[in-house]
Amino acid sequence: MSETGKGPDALVEQRGHTLIVTLNRPEARNALSGEMLSIMVEAWDRVDNDPEIRTCILTGAGGYFCSGMDLKGADKKPPGDSFKDGSYDPSKIPGLLKGRRLTKPLIAAVEGPAIAGGTEILQGTDIRVAGESAKFGISEAKWSLYPMGGSAVRLVRQIPYTIACDMLLTGRHITAAEAKEYGLIGYVVPDGTALDKALEIAETINNNGPLAVQAILKTIRETEGMHEDEAFGPDTRNGIPVFLSEDAKEGPRAFKEKRAPNFQMK
């Protein structure tokens, strides 16, 4: 339960074919909690297993995305204690999208700070939208902590090496404009409109052929790190079933008839 009694630490809502996951601890700048991570893991499972869900959006309540670990709460129990006493729970790590990539597109809608764990979660999303006042950073080294959400591995693969090392080793924060320049995010929008833009993008994807979208994303996932020649194998294997589907007939037929296609995921 959120500390202010405003409900669970993360909210899950389905709008049409889109599942919206909202981090809901605004009184703590949406700092991570065990409850929040558990709800996120359940939401990712729901996205993967429910054929009616075609896209997912991750956002935060109260003008904050996520400020990472709750350092104030660390006074009660130092971060390292869970590794010593056996209370560390690895089942919650997939909530951070570390070692867990969804089978459907995940869009981040960022307002305000996305610091430490906030930027770590961001790296597991596919399309990223941020309000112009958003801030990003990996601050763990400042407090002699380690970015356990995977940034020491992922960030250098997603943005230029020297920028990633700068952020990881100095702990400096960057603006939304800088994040877009470096390729960490794709869209900068007026403050307060990130979710609207994310919903617009999700609806565009939802109107596309879901078999094609999911096959494309599967290829992207499977071929990360592969040599190009090796990657063409899964590329072909994932593409052929799409062409053999009924939806592959419906798409061109709808184009010819100048109407919206009615995809059945068959």
UniProtKB/Swiss-Prot annotation:
Q: Enzyme class, one word? A: lyase
UniProt xrefs under Pfam families:
ECH_1
Any idea what a deletion of this gene does?
Answer: Not required for growth on rich medium.
Active site at which residues? 120, 140
Q: Which UniProt keywords apply?
A: Cholesterol metabolism, Lipid metabolism, Lyase, Steroid metabolism, Sterol metabolism
Q: How does it assemble?
A: Homotrimer; substrate probably binds in elongated tunnels between the subunits.
> Hey, which family's this protein in?
Belongs to the enoyl-CoA hydratase/isomerase family.
Supply the name of the protein: Enoyl-CoA hydratase EchA19
Could you tell me which species this protein originates from?
A: Mycolicibacterium smegmatis (strain ATCC 700084 / mc(2)155)
What lineage does the source organism belong to? Bacteria, Bacillati, Actinomycetota, Actinomycetes, Mycobacteriales
GN (gene name): echA19
